[in-house]
Regions:
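Glycine-rich phosphate/pyrophosphate-binding beta-alpha loops
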Residues: 80, 84, 495-507
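Glycine-rich loop(s) and the adjacent beta-strand/alpha-helix scaffold that form part
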Residues: 24, 28, 35-45, 206-209, ...
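FAD cofactor-binding and catalytic pocket of flavoenzymes
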Residues: 63, 69, 106, 291-413, ...
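Redox-cofactor-proximal catalytic regions of oxidoreductases
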Residues: 50-132
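Conserved redox-cofactor binding core of oxidoreductases
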Residues: 110-230, 454-459
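A glycine-rich dinucleotide-binding beta-alpha-beta segment and adjacent secondary-structure elements
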Residues: 62, 197-200, 238, 414-500
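Beta1/beta-strand and adjacent pyrophosphate-binding region of the FAD-binding site
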Residues: 1-14, 266
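Residue-level detector of alpha-helix initiation sites
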Residues: 12-13, 271, 422, 497
């Protein structure tokens, strides 16, 4: 029976940081990742059928984008070595200090994490878009803030992207991959610089995007950590005398693997970690003393999207980094609603979907595509669209649990989400209304998507909570360092532990919390 000192489940912003730092401390680290290891030449195109992940048949379909549908809420998740960094929009920003003043363990405050925010920014090579590389969307954002008399709220956001100061869109073949300049990062990995090709969310072909496999995970492997792709963990059980046994489905070999570890770190993301622990407590009964707070306190982080159209303005949403700038209303000055407006971009894959009215049927059925196609009925050119995006600080109104399947009502083994939209309504509606105001002042045309206006449906790529950190077992699932109450040496370190909405992109916060957790390691 294989035994290691530290077993990490998942390789996103929590798992990657922990793998790196614990390997540096000399631990024998093994990382089990459900998805594949992706290279630029493997990245999906609109013609491919297998780039989506299917949780019901992962042996057959193990692409890197996992869409989950939970009634009124849909969640987009990453699947692959690097986790959510494979599909996120590069934004690497710290929340305002007041976020940590309520609902967090006493040990966690902004000052506690300040140095960890700095270190994670260095590891991710965080930069901002050079002034001469502003996209039409960036300029529209600046104009909108200015016309509302709120220029002070506008800012270019920090991104985990490498930019070439000599690049500009006036170059011949400016968007050609050949314009990318290669360089070697601190972990010895070859990367390129951004050529504004617009495919950040679905795979940077020049490796300008600083995904975790190029930094934290690369460093972990340098220090002896082993990453095993296509290993889907199904259960964890404690061992007599200490440690844990983990059962994983090896999707490549189509075989079961059992591994024992002194310490186990669950880092499968908000949905993945919560589901795994729910199954261990309620389905397999291997971790029966997990807190009753498990699954509760989940939030979509208030993500919202409004497509706007400018008939006389070329905005080229499929060019440039996916998100470049923000207009910050996190101070609550808009009637108490707190939100962070961003310019959105759409990768060429989704752009092609819309241009051709949805030739990829599974993606065409997603709520994002439905919202976009709703506004294509008058055949307004895709290049004239502004995807207003953003996050809002909603109240956690979600609870994950295991429910019944209609065809097997005697079993409770299907992950369900009970989500109360009323706890998100004030913040999300404030963001939605702001999108309309920004559109109007800049001469565009937009309506709040019917999916929200009529049905109160949302989609989020930034799920948070489910294994919330707290000071007591009654309040949460893990303590300030991510250790699970009642189960020594079992940890959760990822977005599942964040006990509330941040109101902006969460990757930097998750990385900083993981840096903090690793620093507590003994």
């Amino acid at each position: 029976m294989e035994r290691v000192s530290t077993l990490i489940i998942g390789s996103g912003f929590g798992g990657a940081v922990m793998a790196c730092r614990l390997a540096e401390k000399g631990d024998k680290v093994v990382v089990l990742e459900r998805g594949r290891r992706w290279l630029p030449e493997d990245y999906p195109s609109v013609s491919q059928r297998d780039w989506l992940w299917d949780e019901d048949e992962p042996e057959q379909q193990n692409g890197w984008l996992d869409f989950r549908y939970f009634g009124d809420m849909s969640v987009a998740l990453g699947a692959g070595v690097g986790g959510g960094s494979l599909i996120y929009a590069n934004v690497s920003v710290a929340p305002p200090p007041e976020v940590f003043e309520r609902g967090w363990p006493e040990a966690i405050r902004f000052d506690t994490l300040r140095e960890h925010f700095r270190v994670s920014g260095e590891m991710l090579n965080v930069q901002t878009l050079p002034d001469h590389q502003w996209t039409p969307r960036t300029r529209l954002m600046h104009e909108a803030a200015d016309k509302l008399g709120q220029r002070h709220r506008f800012r270019v956001v920090p991104q985990a992207v490498s930019f070439d100061p000599d690049w500009h869109n006036g170059l011949d073949n400016a968007y050609s991959y050949g314009r990318s300049k290669t360089w070697t990062n601190a972990q010895g990995r070859t990367q390129g610089t951004c050529v504004h090709c617009g495919n950040c969310d679905l795979g940077c072909p020049v490796r300008a995007k600083n995904t975790l496999d190029l930094n934290y995970l690369a460093r972990a492997e340098e220090q002896g950590a082993e990453i095993r792709p296509l290993h889907h963990v199904r259960w964890i059980r404690p061992l007599q005398g200490g440690g844990y046994e983990v059962g994983a489905n090896d999707l490549d070999a189509r075989a079961w693997r059992l591994i024992r570890a002194d310490k186990v770190i669950v880092a499968a993301g908000s949905v993945g970690s919560t589901e795994l622990l729910l199954r261990c407590r309620d389905q397999y009964k291997t971790l029966p003393r997990l807190s009753r707070a498990l699954g509760r306190g989940w939030t979509s982080n208030g993500d919202f999207f409004t497509p706007a159209f400018y008939p006389d303005r070329q905005l080229a949403p499929s060019r440039g980094p996916t998100i470049t700038s923000a207009i910050d209303y996190l101070d609550g000055s808009d009637g108490g609603a707190r939100y962070f407006v961003e310019d959105g971009g759409l990768p060429d894959v989704l752009g092609n979907l819309l241009r051709h009215a949805g030739k990829h049927p599974k993606l065409a059925r997603t709520r994002l595509a439905a919202a976009l196609l709703e506004y294509r009925r008058d055949n307004t050119p895709f290049e004239n669209m502004m995807p207003w995006f953003g996050q809002a600080r909603d109240e956690p109104g979600g609870r994950f649990y295991l429910g019944r399947r209609w065809y097997a009502p005697w079993k409770r083994d299907r992950l369900r989400l009970s989500w109360d939209y009323r706890k998100a309504e004030k913040a999300v509606q404030g963001l939605a209304d702001r999108h309309l105001a920004l559109t109007e002042v800049t001469g565009g045309r937009a309506n709040t998507p019917a999916t929200w206006r009529w049905f109160k449906n949302l989609i989020t790529p930034h799920p948070l909570g489910g294994c919330n950190m707290a000071d007591t077992e009654k309040q949460g699932v893990v303590n300030h360092a991510g250790e699970v109450f009642n189960y020594p040496q079992l940890f959760v370190v990822d977005g599942a532990t964040v006990p509330g909405s941040l109101g902006l992109n969460p990757s930097r916060t998750i990385a900083a919390l993981a840096e903090y957790a690793a620093a507590q390691w003994r």
